[in-house]
Amino acid sequence: MSSGGLLLLLGLLTLWAELTPISGHDRPKFCYLPADPGECMAYIRSFHYDSESKKCKEFIYGGCHGNANNFPTRDKCRQTCRGK
C-alpha cells in the first residue's frame, strides 16, 4: 500500500474514533464514582458525572484528594464520560 493510502486509512480511522459515541461499556470506571469534595477547604466549582441521571452535575471541590470523577468544566465531563 502506498504512503498516501496509509495516510488516508489513518485519517479515516481517526475520524471514526472521534465520531463514535462512548457506550456504557467503554466509559472509564471512574465516571461511576460518586462526587467527592475531598478533605481540604477550598471552594472550587467542579463537575462530576452522575451515573444514575447520566448527566454531568456541578459540585464544590475542596482542592485536594477526592477522586478522578472531577472535571473543571461541564464540557470536559461530557467528553470523558458521556461522549458528547
From Swiss-Prot:
This is Kunitz-type serine protease inhibitor 3. Gene3D superfamilies: Pancreatic trypsin inhibitor Kunitz domain. GO terms for molecular function: serine-type endopeptidase inhibitor activity. It comes from Daboia russelii. Expressed by the venom gland. The keyword Signal applies. SMART domains: KU. Belongs to the venom Kunitz-type family.
